[in-house]
Amino acid sequence: EMLLKLAGLPYQTNRGGFRRAPKGKLPYIDDNGEIVADSTLIRLHIERKYGFDFDAGLTPEQRGAAWMFEKALEDHFYWHVVQARWCDAENFAKGPASFFRAIPWPVRPIVQAAIRRKIRGTLHGQGTGRFTPQEQAQLLKRGAQAAAQLLGDKPYFFGASPCGADATAFGFIASAMSPHFHMTLRD
């Protein structure tokens, strides 16, 4: 959503569109019939189709650092959020369980258990699921400290104006800080 806001493009939000999501997860956009899934691919689509440069004003070095920071969020922090939402029973009941409302009750718990087992397997294969809760908390804390150090006292991560990395960071920070879910990062 932040990418669309930064680019100044009109949009409508629909958080229930998993059936149309080509990668089986959010986000995705429907740009006049062209479905684009994944936040990075959405960014590239906006840059290509609308000529918007999310990193305008950044030096080549800053562009590289911003891209690496985004990937650290997407390929590290993301999995800790998935772990917290899908593997913690209390968080699952508050959020992801609602994705299964359309499934009739007698089979709903079976489907939920199967999907959660699949997600645990994905987390194990990716690596996050192999860490103890204490190790996960330590890694998450270290990542949050690194992000805070990168931000410093600047209004945005790479200067006076928001860039693509800020849009990515905002989404993850908002998700992690949601009072609706328990996240060790807030503790």
Model features per residue range: what roles?
Residues W79-D187:
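GST-like fold's C-terminal all-alpha helical module
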Residues E1-P109:
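GST-like domain detector, emphasizing the conserved glutathione-binding G-site
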